[in-house]
Structure formats: structure tokens, C-alpha cells
């Protein structure tokens, strides 16, 4: 079994959902982001989703856009990011590590070179945020060559044709959107309906994780109890980073408390 299969199997046995925090590598600095990642792991993260900074992150709301800009201002490059991911992997051998990246960054590296770097660094999955499923075959094929899982986004209004397409390619997990649009917590709570979850599961047995706007324990409990395998939480964590940019000790404490609280909410048996 790969790392995703292992973690989902273990969590299922313990009757827990999977908690996946998202942060942007290099935000607010590379050293601080690595401290944050270690705090996330130490306090309940079951897997990681790490954003590679990009100048025009169209799929993301203002919170994550600003995180990308802060990271880009540090003038790090993709080679440094892969180096630090490799160091993370040496320290944390079992946690699944996924990347969220935009297509231009992959093309700039060359597909084979990019996925080879992922493999050598210990990356488990890649989600390319701006590539629709109908244009994904070249990425998926190359990812498979290097045993990297391709993660695909499933919107809440997906029709049968899209669900079928996703079922052909999805590995690791499927990223189920709480709502259409971009990331962030500006909107009211959105819950994925049980009927829609059943519909997705008709096509695929890959675990389903809900993302976009996850910011409190009610949302987490609702997601797990409705049949999803877990949640992805990004903007709420990045808001903490932004709020305490110049108070690192407080930032780390607030992130620790938040992650512990949301991870506790994934447990179906208290």
C-alpha cells in the first residue's frame, strides 16, 4: 500500500476522518513555513497539502493569493522547495505529502523532470489547480510513470460525465469542493449533500476529502458524518499566519490550538 492507502486504512479502523492542512511553502518565509509544517504534523495533520508559490493563483481566494505573494517576495525557487520537501520526508517518513501547483510551473520544469523531482523528494501526489480533467492526460500519464498520484477536483455540481472522467484518473483521493468558486472562508457554510457523495462513490472507491471554506469543527463533523473521508483546511490556517506575521510565537500557538481542535473533530467516537 502507498502512504495514502495506509493512512486512510488506519483512520478507518480508528473511526477517524483525515485532516489535511494546506499551507504555501515559503509563507511568510521558508524557515517559518517549515516550522509551521512541523507544528501541523505534531498536532494532528494526517497528510499535507503544500502550495508551490505562483504569481497568478486563479483558483485561490484573496487569503491564499496574499500567501503566494508573501512567499514569492522571499525569492526562493522550486529547487529550494524540493530540497526542503526532501528534508521533510526524511524526518516524517509516513505522512502523505501532496503538492498544489499551477501548470506553468510544471511546464517550466518539463513534465518528466518535474515528476522525477517529486518522486525523488518523497512527494505522494500532485494537484494541478488550473488544468481541467479533459486536458489532464499528459500530466496523469507522466505522473503514473513516476508513481505520483494525480489529484482531481470534483465540484458540487459535477454531472455524470465529469464523475466518470474523474473515476478514470483519480488516485490518492478526490478533492470535493464545498461550493463552486475560489478558496476562502468568506462565504457561509456549505455542506456536500449525502446524495451527491453516494453518487460520486458509485463511480469510484477513492477516498473523498472536502475542501474550500473549512474553518470550524461543525463543518468537519458534518463532512465526516455525511460519508466523506476527511477535510482539507487552508485559508483558516493562512489567516492565522497573516494575523500574527510579526508575532511568531503567538502564531505557532494559535496554529497548534486550531489544528488540535479540528483534528479532534474528525473523531467519530469521542
Curated annotation (Swiss-Prot):
Xref: InterPro entries: Aldolase_TIM (IPR013785), RibuloseP-bd_barrel (IPR011060), Trp_synthase_alpha_AS (IPR018204), Trp_synthase_suA (IPR002028)
Matching SUPFAM superfamilies: Ribulose-phoshate binding barrel
UniProt GO MF annotations: tryptophan synthase activity
Alphabetized Pfam families for the sequence: Trp_syntA (PF00290)
Catalysed transformations (reactions): (1S,2R)-1-C-(indol-3-yl)glycerol 3-phosphate + L-serine = D-glyceraldehyde 3-phosphate + L-tryptophan + H2O
Pathway: Amino-acid biosynthesis; L-tryptophan biosynthesis; L-tryptophan from chorismate: step 5/5
GO CC, any one term: cytosol
Keyword Amino-acid biosynthesis appears in the UniProt entry: yes
Protein keywords: Amino-acid biosynthesis, Aromatic amino acid biosynthesis, Lyase, Tryptophan biosynthesis
Assigned protein family: Belongs to the TrpA family.
Subunit text: Tetramer of two alpha and two beta chains.
Record's function text: The alpha subunit is responsible for the aldol cleavage of indoleglycerol phosphate to indole and glyceraldehyde 3-phosphate.
HAMAP family in the record: Trp_synth_alpha (MF_00131)
Protein name: Tryptophan synthase alpha chain
Organism field: Buchnera aphidicola subsp. Diuraphis noxia
Lineage: Bacteria, Pseudomonadati, Pseudomonadota, Gammaproteobacteria, Enterobacterales
